[in-house]
Amino acid sequence: PFLRTKKKALKARFKQRKKWITALVLFVNFGILAALKYRNFAADNINLLFGTHFSSAKLLLPLGISFYTFQSMGYLIDVYRGKYAPDRNPFRFALFVSFFPQILQGPIGRYDRLASQLYGQKGFSLTRIERGLQLMLWGYFKKIVIADRAAVVVSEVFGNYQSYGGILVMAGVLCYSLQLYGDFSGGMDVIMGASECFGISLDTNFKRPYFAQSISDFWHRWHITLGTWMKDYVFYPFSLSKGMNKFGKYCKKHFGKHGGIYCSNRHFYVLLNQSLSHLPQRC
């Protein structure tokens, strides 16, 4: 009994230590990401509010830092949860995190779906390369022919909006929608095509969002892997936490049928985190 009790105590201590180490690593990595992306935004707003002349350090933002931070932290959380064993080979892990086609626009890969493709043997396939190059060509068409041409109209209309009437402003809005679509969809096609040439199938990240039938359906089609990352690593842990359960009971007790505030609060928290993952701008 004594040995069993001691073993349980050691196991509990190890579990607690693992929890704190995981939390520390998450805090440090997301803290670095926030500091790099928000330092100029914070300095500008402090100067605006208080009339100061504070200047932030001039640092270059590492290429793709958001994507490989989210991807590596998702891996860390999965290992902590025991979903799979950690890969102790640093070079294999570096390959998983920094696979070059997905650095700029994603998708945010999951270790269990991507690692086996990266580490396995790949044979030469002319058909696969042709398919990948065709997809890349289609992506460049969206970017160069659609997005860049629409950007000319957008820049002119919104750069000199005082000179244009309602119909032309509406045309500028429509062209901006085309520009966004061409930039993101075209970029994803190039990424998927380049990966296909290497025999790697990445997760779908963009699925005809302008054909969505509702706002919810739209968000399930646009930047899909970021949405699923937020769902798995933010929404569910946040929703099932003790604090949110207590808040839910409080809402039901004091608001009755209006306890939906609890549900909307969870979605607001996730959408806030999702918006903060992009570069901030002051309107």
Language-model region placement:
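Membrane-embedded transmembrane alpha-helical bundles that form the catalytic cores
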Residues: P1-C283
